[in-house]
Amino acid sequence: MSDINATRLPIWGIGCDPCIGDDVTILLTRGE
C-alpha cells in the first residue's frame, strides 16, 4: 500500500497520457 501511495502523486502528474492514465486507474483499483 505504501508503495502505491508514494508513487500515486507523480504518476497522476505524468498520467496526462490516456494510456498511462488507464494503467494507473487499473493499478489503483487493484491496490485499493
From Swiss-Prot:
GO terms for molecular function: toxin activity. Pfam families: Amanitin. InterPro entries: Amanitin/phalloidin (IPR027582). Keywords: Thioether bond, Toxin. Processed by the macrocyclase-peptidase enzyme POPB to yield a toxic cyclic decapeptide. POPB first removes 10 residues from the N-terminus. Conformational trapping of the remaining peptide forces the enzyme to release this intermediate rather than proceed to macrocyclization. The enzyme rebinds the remaining peptide in a different conformation and catalyzes macrocyclization of the N-terminal 8 residues. Residues 1-10, 19-32 form a propeptide. There is a cross-link at I11-P18 (Cyclopeptide (Ile-Pro)). It comes from the Eukaryota. Belongs to the MSDIN fungal toxin family. This is Beta-amanitin proprotein. The lineage of its organism: Eukaryota, Fungi, Dikarya, Basidiomycota, Agaricomycotina.
